[in-house]
Amino acid sequence: MNPITSKFDKVLNASSEYGHVNHEPDSSKEQQRNTPQKSMPFSDQIGNYQRNKGIPVQSYDNSKIYIIGSGIAGMSAAYYFIRDGHVPAKNITFLEQLHIDGGSLDGAGNPTDGYIIRGGREMDMTYENLWDMFQDIPALEMPAPYSVLDEYRLINDNDSNYSKARLINNKGEIKDFSKFGLNKMDQLAIIRLLLKNKEELDDLTIEDYFSESFLKSNFWTFWRTMFAFENWHSLLELKLYMHRFLHAIDGLNDLSSLVFPKYNQYDTFVTPLRKFLQEKGVNIHLNTLVKDLDIHINTEGKVVEGIITEQDGKEVKIPVGKNDYVIVTTGSMTEDTFYGNNKTAPIIGIDNSTSGQSAGWKLWKNLAAKSEIFGKPEKFCSNIEKSAWESATLTCKPSALIDKLKEYSVNDPYSGKTVTGGIITITDSNWLMSFTCNRQPHFPEQPDDVLVLWVYALFMDKEGNYIKKTMLECTGDEILAELCYHLGIEDQLENVQKNTIVRTAFMPYITSMFMPRAKGDRPRVVPEGCKNLGLVGQFVETNNDVVFTMESSVRTARIAVYKLLNLNKQVPDINPLQYDIRHLLKAAKTLNDDKPFVGEGLLRKVLKGTYFEHVLPAGAAEEEEHESFIAEHVNKFREWVKGIRG
């Protein structure tokens, strides 16, 4: 008998639902209707009703939790074990191969040697799991009882994000970025993709499906540079992204739908979360390499009985009891990173024949060798020329580069407010180079006269316009020269180089999670038959969420905890805004460059002066009224349906 619920035993013992919660409901499969048999919330219902406390089915005072990897997924798992599973924090141990926690959420350096951030975070207000966690994590700089979310809201509510120079070309001229430039057939292709079932898209690439005109449109330039998609990446993942961010499509060109942190990703998220966990009592063992798991497999299931580690050069096996649990972060987007600086290019010590041998990938491969339920890691780590790119972090003292930056900034770069509002893409760059300056300082102890900029390029294997080398062959100074050329300040290059420290990072797997995939290539969070093992991170299957976000890492961690402990809680599916008629209508108009969509005039006529008039997108769609008004729009609608059906 559970002492927590003993007063409810009559109800619970008679319930067919108790102990059988669907922890990962799927909104793409659910018809939402209330019935006498329905007792749980709809699959994507969000809000405070979902904030009920988890009730453990047993005591975990003697259970040990081993979390392999201390990135955001692993840390989130620890948080949910503590908050919802009521597992004592002292029972939780991280096993981390590196000398520092945080995984891919890095941010380090100083003004003398230069700062480095391999990537950054473009955040969305609909990251329900991320904000669910960070509303409970004490703030980095505000006093108790304020949280990380409170800090995030405070700065973003009072400093709106937008870009005034999303695209530039012709040596620094701001290019018109007000239009998507999609023709009617390309708009219909997007709609057809949204209508397709996910099962139809196994192993298809974006260029398999979309036309050349789509791939040359402003829309695709906005999309690919914001999210780091390549033409050869997964069409399925692109579809999921379009559903996930449909509500934000009218902010795609000026980035006004984004909310950014005050500092870099490590100081904003990792530092306060790690501090919270350590104060609760979790154990973090750094420099501990996990090589394999000892899994007992029989007809009754799969049980982890040991963790094979390497510590101080010696193999050590950690026993795992039947009441213990193991969480593994599979794969890695930032392992095998190679670094360069002002005077040296990264020395790349990897190719397709040697890829996927680092710790995170090797562990996943060892699991996959035991059973097909653990997926196919080689689908993601075996083609690095299609999964890699290089970034550069610029630590800048005042120079001609900063003077030029001010022309593209919505606020003074030294004001602490939004600067570029996100990436600025150079459309005539052979490398398709983009750069950004987020709120400054980007590091808490950063000097007042220093700015930190970030640069990356999608076509790093192409010869530069100014420096006749590929980006990979370039030193930091040469990458800086290429940037200055595109900004029209190459004549002041000596001044810029003298005042700029460049640290580069080549990441062979940075978009490996975007590689084309099919059903079964990624394992489920709790693979079939696993009793005490959960897999988390960017390379596990969720119903409808996307990869390359902190939200998906937190989601997988939360699912793992709820499933393994069989808690009385669901992890709601992605925010349901994709089904909101307001956002669907807005998207239709936005894709058409704010010109009326088919049937808009009729809708405005029907809804004019009614309570629901406001659901229509902004902007009048005045059309000439005549006797055949309705017939004309019915015919247009028929043609539109024909187009969708292809």
UniProtKB/Swiss-Prot annotation:
Cofactor entry: FAD
EC number: 4.2.1.53
UniProt pH dependence: Optimum pH is around 6.
Comment on activity versus temperature: Optimum temperature is 25 degrees Celsius.
Entry binding sites for FAD: A73, E96, Q97, S104, E122, Y127, V290, S332, T549, S553
Top EC class for this record: lyase
Catalytic activity reported: (R)-10-hydroxyoctadecanoate = (9Z)-octadecenoate + H2O
Full protein name: Oleate hydratase
Organism: Elizabethkingia meningoseptica
